[in-house]
Curated annotation (Swiss-Prot):
PANTHER family: FMN-DEPENDENT NADH-AZOREDUCTASE 1, FMN-DEPENDENT NADH:QUINONE OXIDOREDUCTASE
Residues the record lists as binding FMN: S10, S16, T17, S18, T138, Q139, G140, G141
UniProt enzyme class: oxidoreductase
InterPro entries per the UniProt record, alphabetical: Flavodoxin_fold, Flavoprotein-like_sf, FMN-dep_NADH:Q_OxRdtase_AzoR1, NADH:quinone_OxRdtase_FMN_depd
Co-factor binding comment: Binds 1 FMN per subunit.
Any Pfam family: Flavodoxin_2
Classification lineage: Bacteria, Bacillati, Actinomycetota, Actinomycetes, Frankiales
Subunit structure and binding partners: Homodimer.
Protein name: FMN-dependent NADH:quinone oxidoreductase
A GO molecular function held by the record: FMN binding
The protein's required cofactors: FMN
Family annotation (SUPFAM superfamilies): Flavoproteins (SSF52218)
Length: 211
C-alpha cells in the first residue's frame, strides 16, 4: 500500500496556486492508487520551529542524558522524520517567497536532515533513495534566461540540492510562473504566459500521478 507524504507551504489557504496544483496531483494520485494513503503536513498551519541548539545537540547526546529541553525538541523532530521515513513518495508544493523558499520549509528541512540517519554518505543510501519525489514550484514572476531578474531564483537550486543530498533520484519538478499576472495589473500583459504555464503544469502533474 503506497504512502504519499504531501508537504504544503503556502501561507494562503484560499487562492493559492501551489495548493490548487497540489490538489490536482492528489486527486489523480488517489484515482491511480485507490489503496494508497496520504500523509499531509501543512507548514503554514503548523509551522515547525527553527532548529535550536537543544534539539540539534540531542542528536549527539545519549537519550538517557537528555535535558527536558532536548527531550521536547526531539519529540517533534522524530515526528517529522518519521513521516518522511514512512513515505514511498513525496510531494512538495512550494511557492516562491522573496526569491527563495518559504521559511517554514527551510525549518522543516533543518528538522528532517539528520546526518547518519536521513542523510548518509554516500547520498544513495539516504532517506529518499528509491522514493518518487514531485515538486510543485510556483513563482509570481519569471526568472529564466533573458528575463530582467535572471539569476534571482534561489528557490529551485535550494530544493534541488536538498533532494540530492537526501538521495532522491526520481524527481520531477513542475514549475508554474507568472502566477501574479492575473491579480497584479502591472503584470497583466503576461497573463497568457501564466495560463500556458499552468495548463502545462496541470497536465504534467496528472501524468506523473497516474504513472
Amino acid at each position: 500500500m503506497p504512502n504519499l507524504l504531501h508537504v504544503d507551504a503556502s501561507l494562503a489557504q484560499e487562492g493559492s496556486t501551489s495548493r490548487s496544483l497540489a490538489a490536482t496531483y492528489i486527486d489523480a494520485w488517489r484515482a491511480a492508487h485507490p489503496d494508497g494513503t496520504v500523509t499531509y503536513r501543512d507548514l503554514a498551519l503548523t509551522p515547525p520551529p527553527h532548529l535550536d541548539w537543544a534539539t540539534l545537540s540531542a542528536a549527539f547526546t545519549p537519550p538517557e542524558q537528555h535535558t527536558p529541553e532536548q527531550t521536547e525538541g526531539v519529540k517533534l523532530r522524530e515526528e517529522l522524520i518519521g513521516e518522511l521515513e514512512a513515505a514511498d513518495e513525496l510531494l512538495l508544493s512550494l511557492p516562491m517567497y522573496n526569491y527563495s523558499v518559504p521559511s517554514t520549509f527551510k525549518a522543516w528541512v533543518d528538522q528532517v536532515i539528520l546526518v547518519g540517519r536521513t542523510l548518509q554518505q554516500p547520498p544513495a543510501e539516504s532517506v529518499l533513495t528509491g522514493d518518487r519525489v514531485t515538486v510543485i514550484a510556483t513563482q509570481g514572476g519569471s526568472y529564466g534566461v533573458g528575463t530582467p531578474k535572471e539569476g534571482w531564483d534561489h528557490q529551485l537550486p535550494f530544493i534541488a540540492h536538498v533532494l540530492e543530498s537526501l538521495g532522491a533520484t526520481d524527481v520531477e519538478l513542475v514549475r508554474v510562473e507568472m502566477t501574479l499576472a492575473p491579480v497584479n495589473p502591472a503584470l497583466a500583459d503576461f497573463t497568457d504566459v501564466y495560463e500556458r504555464s499552468r495548463a502545462a503544469g496541470e497536465s504534467a502533474l496528472r501524468a506523473r500521478a497516474a504513472a
